[in-house]
């Protein structure tokens, strides 16, 4: 309202909003109610721009009248979402190619990120898990269009089956023992577990879903708590004197926790998705990914947490 009543020729302002707020109709209408002259002068900068392709935001893009736009993302492509990808590219006017690209390899070679070593650990499903996985896969085959090479549409039954199958992989029982071995080996080699990030298995949402998707399943939160508690407990079983902190959604003293992690007062952070985007933990030296989601975006984002440069990190 104050912007609408101001002298447009003397305006100088910055509006900051989250994607969750931007997607709300009331907030969106308020932003779009600015005069056409103001909107022509504005510059829209979208960080983590891949989120623009989320269904609840994508539906509003044709009503955005701000012409000058910059989209920033280390992971611009949305997995299994051609429609969302097309919408993002069109919105920022780069249908054919990106305006500017800077690869992770270039960032490492130019000294902006540190070099790293990556060690995959293969975990196999047990007999019961494999039997259930095959059973669900046969059910999913009925939805698959061989000619198109993709699933024919997306409905509730298909989504539930995909989610159910994904949970089998993420919650595979053998992961716990492999994780225990990795933690024990690190502790024996270094005598400490300082500066370690642990990404606990998820399985609560599909890789192609967005952070704004909701769930009506009350057991999801219970599963999350059980999983993160279990992996936190394993760390403490290997080294009872190690300080471990769960980094979860809604954590009250977030900045304090990250500060204590950087000084080594908190040695290990266990998390699910809260350390994916927008969190800087440059002091981290080891990250353990307990879930191979197959989602390139998540893998890149998580590597980004540990590849930040720090004066005391010599890798």
Task: List each model region and its residues.
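Conserved helix/coil segment N-terminal to the catalytic DExD/H
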Residues: 2-40, 54-60, 274
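Conserved RecA-like P-loop NTPase helicase motor core
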Residues: 50-52, 239-315
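Conserved helicase/translocase motor-coupling segment
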Residues: 139-259
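Inter-lobe coupling linker of SF2 helicases/translocases
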Residues: 90-156, 160, 173-178, 182-185
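SF2 helicase/translocase ATPase core recognition
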Residues: 71-74, 81, 118-136, 288-315
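Structural recognition of the conserved hydrophobic beta-strand(s) that form the central parallel beta-sheet
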Residues: 15-18, 67-74, 268-271
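Post-DEXD/H (motif II) to motif III coupling segment of the RecA-like Helicase ATP-binding lobe
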Residues: 51-116
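Hydrophobic residues in beta-strands of the RecA-like P-loop NTPase core, especially within AAA+ ATPase
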Residues: 45-46
């Amino acid at each position: 309202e104050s912007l609408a009543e101001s002298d447009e020729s003397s305006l100088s302002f910055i509006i900051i909003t989250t994607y969750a707020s931007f997607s709300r109709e009331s907030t969106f209408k308020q932003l779009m109610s600015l005069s056409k002259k103001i909107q022509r002068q504005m510059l829209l900068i979208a960080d983590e721009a891949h989120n623009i392709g989320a269904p609840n935001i994508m539906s509003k893009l044709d009503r955005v009248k701000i012409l000058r736009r910059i989209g920033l993302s280390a992971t611009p492509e949305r997995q299994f979402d051609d429609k969302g990808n097309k919408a993002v590219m069109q919105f920022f006017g780069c249908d054919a190619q990106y305006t500017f690209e800077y690869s992770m390899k270039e960032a490492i070679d130019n000294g902006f990120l540190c070099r790293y070593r990556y060690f995959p650990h293969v975990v196999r499903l047990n007999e019961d898990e494999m039997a259930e996985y095959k059973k669900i896969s046969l059910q999913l085959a009925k939805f698959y269009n061989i000619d198109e090479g993709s699933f024919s549409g997306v409905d509730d039954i298909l989504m539930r089956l995909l989610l159910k199958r994904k949970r089998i992989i993420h919650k595979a029982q053998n992961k716990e023992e492999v994780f225990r071995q990795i933690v024990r080996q690190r502790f024996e080699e270094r005598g400490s577990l300082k500066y370690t990030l642990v990404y606990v298995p998820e399985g609560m949402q599909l890789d192609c879903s967005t952070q704004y998707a909701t769930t009506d399943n009350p057991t999801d939160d219970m599963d999350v708590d059980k999983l993160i508690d279990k992996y936190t407990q394993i760390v403490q079983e290997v080294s009872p004197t190690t300080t471990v902190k769960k980094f979860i959604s809604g954590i009250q003293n977030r900045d304090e926790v990250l500060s204590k992690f950087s000084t080594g007062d908190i040695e290990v952070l266990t998390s699910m998705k809260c350390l994916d985007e927008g969190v800087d933990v440059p002091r981290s030296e080891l990250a353990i990914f307990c879930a191979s989601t197959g989602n390139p975006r998540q893998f890149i984002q998580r590597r980004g947490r540990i590849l930040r440069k720090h004066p005391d990190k010599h890798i």
